Structures are given as C-alpha cells and as structure tokens.
Amino acid sequence: MKKIIFLAVLLCVSFYGFSQDPKYGVRTGYNISNLDFDGTPINENKHRNGFMIGFFGEYSLSKSVAVAPELQFSAEGAKREAFKLDYIQLPVMFKFRISERFALAAGPQAGVKVHKTEDGIKNFAYSGVAGIEIKISHQFFADARYTYGFTNIFEDYIPAEAINTNIQLGLGFKF
C-alpha cells in the first residue's frame, strides 16, 4: 500500500516539470462491476453496484495530449459476498482531446485489494482502462470508463478463472 501511494506521489511530482498547465482534482462515481468467468461460473454471478472516489493530477504534454495519474478507491467484483472486491487503484490515463469539450482516454491500471488478504483471490490486479470525458464547465466534467482485467483474480491453487470488468460513470472537479 505504501509503495502505491509513493508511486502516485512520485508520478504527480515528476510530471509537474513537463506540464505547461498542471491541474489537480477529485472524481467520484458509480461502478457497475462483474466477474467474467472462463467457462461456467462457480456460483450465480450477478453484477455488483458500487462507488469509486479518488484524486488525480493532469499534465498537458501538448495542446491535445495529457497524462493523468490517479489514486482511487473502487468497489468492484460481483454481488456475492465472497466476490466483493474493493481496491486501491492507480490508473495512468493518457487523454487525447478531440474537441473543446470531449476527450478520449486510455491507459493501464494497477490495483491492490483491500480488506481480505487470504481468501483465494489475488491481492494485486492489472487492467486496461478506456473512456470518454465531457467538459461541463471550466472546472466540472463527467466521464464514462470501461475497465477490463488482464489477470485471473483467483490464486493459482483455485481451479477457476475469472477477470474483473467494470463500467464507471463519474463526475469530477478540477482545481
């Protein structure tokens, strides 16, 4: 956990020197999450509704390209209690402005599971994230993202495979 926080701070500080107009902010939103099983699910597999909250730095690399490292809490997984997975995540989004109000974003994400640590589910998760951002005003924005897990959530000794998928609908404020 300390390593992820240190990495987030290091990313924010290191990009500060490259950026022409750094922005910082917070975002929060609603998650619709599910586990995508390879084959037949172990149990009934219903999606989980949850929330996310976090903060970010956004650093312009050019007029139309920016990088935005984030640190967020995200409630994901599935509805069944054993599959409720909460993560502290570090997405690094590369944003491509396509107009004054719209931007496309994509990037990698690493996550550390919080709460239960020895439950047969891996403590680290790696994902890809893609989405769109809509500028509401100079400071407010809305976004929609899709997260696709790259790694099996189960430990190697569990005879099942599943990845975490997530739709995020968010609102944010830039300082």
Regions picked out by a protein language model, each given a short descriptive name:
Residues 22, 64-67, 101-104, 134, ...:
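Repeated loop/turn-to-beta-strand initiation elements of outer-membrane beta-barrel proteins
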Residues 26-28, 69, 92, 106, ...:
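Membrane-embedded beta-strand positions of outer-membrane beta-barrel proteins
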Residues 23, 31, 130-141, 163-175:
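Outer-membrane beta-barrel "beta-signal"
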Residues 30-34, 73-77, 110-114, 146-152, ...:
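Transmembrane beta-strands of outer-membrane beta-barrel pores
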Residues 42-80:
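Glycine- and aromatic-enriched membrane insertion/assembly motifs of diderm outer-membrane
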Residues 20-22, 45-51, 84-88, 122-126, ...:
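Residues that define the transmembrane beta-barrel architecture of outer-membrane proteins
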